[in-house]
UniProtKB/Swiss-Prot annotation:
<keyword id="KW-0325">Glycoprotein</keyword>
<dbReference type="Pfam" id="PF13855">
    <property type="entry name" value="LRR_8"/>
</dbReference>
<feature type="glycosylation site" description="N-linked (GlcNAc...) (keratan sulfate) asparagine">
    <location>
        <position position="88"/>
    </location>
</feature>
<protein>
    <recommendedName>
        <fullName>Mimecan</fullName>
    </recommendedName>
</protein>
<dbReference type="InterPro" id="IPR003591">
    <property type="entry name" value="Leu-rich_rpt_typical-subtyp"/>
</dbReference>
<keyword id="KW-0433">Leucine-rich repeat</keyword>
<feature type="signal peptide">
    <location>
        <begin position="1"/>
        <end position="19"/>
    </location>
</feature>
<feature type="repeat" description="LRR 2">
    <location>
        <begin position="132"/>
        <end position="155"/>
    </location>
</feature>
<feature type="repeat" description="LRR 4">
    <location>
        <begin position="180"/>
        <end position="199"/>
    </location>
</feature>
<dbReference type="GO" id="GO:0005615">
    <property type="term" value="C:extracellular space"/>
</dbReference>
<keyword id="KW-1015">Disulfide bond</keyword>
<comment type="function">
    <text>Induces bone formation in conjunction with TGF-beta-1 or TGF-beta-2.</text>
</comment>
<feature type="repeat" description="LRR 3">
    <location>
        <begin position="156"/>
        <end position="179"/>
    </location>
</feature>
<feature type="repeat" description="LRR 1">
    <location>
        <begin position="112"/>
        <end position="131"/>
    </location>
</feature>
<feature type="repeat" description="LRR 6">
    <location>
        <begin position="226"/>
        <end position="246"/>
    </location>
</feature>
<keyword id="KW-0964">Secreted</keyword>
<feature type="disulfide bond">
    <location>
        <begin position="255"/>
        <end position="288"/>
    </location>
</feature>
Amino acid sequence: MKTLRSTLLLLLFVPLIKPAPPAPQESPLTFDYAADHLEEAIFSQDYEDKYLDGKNIEEKQTMVRSVKRSLELQKDESVTPAPPKKENDEMPTCLLCVCLSGSVYCEEVDIDAVPPLPKESAYLYARFNKIKKLTAKDFADMPNLRRLDFTGNLIEDIEDGTFSKLALLEELSLAENQLLKLPVLPPKLTLFNAKYNKIKSRGIKANTFKKLNNLSFLYLDHNALESVPPNLPESLRVIHLQFNNITSITDDTFCKANDTRYIRDRIEEIRLEGNPIALGKHPNSFICLKRLPIGTYF
């Protein structure tokens, strides 16, 4: 009975009981990293822009000052007169030739005369052109020449004294031209080449080679010589006389007939092939030589 009464009272008061409102909870503290980073980036960019703007302005100002200074210098230079040129500074224009470090190359350019060249020239190569004559004026102002090469031209005449002022000339090539005679040669020649011309024995004077004490190489092959040139210097090492019209050789041509002990030891090569002569008929002509000439002996 008591239990039933308690149950009824509980049912009567339950509707009157209201649940208490939930206690307000504080929201947890959050950190918006993106927003904060964005603000920092904006600040940094703004600062950097201002810094760079200032730097660019400074650079532009510096550049303007440099340009002004350059213009002032140019103005001063234009007012200042240039020093007069010296005569030694002026050099002839090589025109069709190529001038390089004392060497002048005028090969296969169809010139018919020796062009004006720098005074300092030491080597002139004028091969395979149309030059017909050489004169003393061609080399009057070129005292330093050491080598001249006129191979393959049309040279018929060489004026007297053409090479007289070329005291330093060591090598001279007149090969493959139309020469009938030889000019007076400079004293210091070591090489002379006049092969493939039309030179006859009467076109070579008796003393042409006598005083050339430095001459080592002599090329006179493929000409019209009837005899070996006289008075060949002791300095000769190579003598080319092949394919001429040489018909006779004497005991004095290369040796000394009156001196059987004489030996010509410097000569290394003598070529006489292609001549109408039997070398075997002249045994005493080569007795002073270490090597017999190249040619037909029988």
